[in-house]
Amino acid sequence: EIWIGTDGGGINILDPETRRFSLLEHMPGSDNYSLPANSILCLYNDCNNNMWAGSIRNGLISIREVSMKTYTDVPPGNDRGLSNNTVLSLFQESQDQIWVGTDGGGINSFNPLTEKFTHYSSTWEDKVASICQFTPGKLLISLFSQGVFIFNPATGEKQPFTIVDAKTTALLCNRGKAVNLLRNTHHNILFLGEHIYIYDLNTRTF
């Protein structure tokens, strides 16, 4: 199946064999079995084959065969929800850790076993457009209109990452844009913008 998030039309699910679509959408009065909203920004299939959806202003949605559950924003100091209700990006680092990039609330870490969130104040106000694994203990995060950064969850530190050179970095990141990140092999990370750049983790070169 191919899952497609739409802006207002819920989630369309394509069966490639039959070429037919099925639909997940918001149905008033059926909160446990329908989406909380129909505008979906990102989708992520985790290692347990559960689907996660990031919505516009309606939080993080856990989609399972028998039910759905939504996690929304909470006040600072509360670990039972998001730092911002709009979810731009998702990435699973391990079975008990899902990274959530929000639209202005920075990056959140979510443990699906305990259902607890960790917020990182150093990323507050950041719009986290994409997340991927960089090296053990560190992530690459793409911030809207700011660039790509190496993020250390242990310290909360963000270190700017240069894509090829300063000129290329500025063209890709600093004009109302964001780069999408994909670690497509153990050694390579794809930087997806106007062009595709391949970063080799072994040689640390593009």
Question: Residue spans of the language-model regions?
Answer:
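Carboxylate-rich, polar loop motifs that coordinate divalent cations or form catalytic acidic clusters
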Residues: 1-206
